Amino acid sequence: MAPDVENTRIVSRSGIGSGTGARFVLQFSTGESFTVVGSGLIGRNPRPEPGEFVDHLVTITEPARSVSKTHLEFGQEDGVLWVSDRHSGNGSIIREPGTEPRPCIPGLRYRLTRGTRVDMGEQFVVVS
């Protein structure tokens, strides 16, 4: 092994793509439920971009195709789950308890509290 590789110091990735952090349960209107830690993509057939790495690819069954192939991205920051719309065809709406619904601007991250519902086309997911 080359000396420069042998002496490489491994550093923590602070929950970015490392599968570490708080656990969240994503409960979908389709009846599907997934426990996630770290980062991921949600959709009918989610795929990362070249060079992008995520902990989870969450595929939901959605024959009506109102949910995009890669509809939402999620991750964690300081133990809080965030989502970002991936320029989906039908958009996403955040419905946090006690607040007005907020349409997601594609590419922006929205921090979610447990109990928040995110609409994706004709389907939705509740974070717990």
Spans of features found by a protein language model:
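Short cationic/low-complexity microdomains
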Residues: S33-T35, H87-P103
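Short hydrophobic/aromatic patches on the structural cores and recognition surfaces of FHA
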Residues: I42, H71-F74, V80-S84, N90-I93, ...
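Intrinsically disordered, low-complexity acidic Ser/Thr-rich regulatory segments
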Residues: M1-R65, R117, Q123-V127
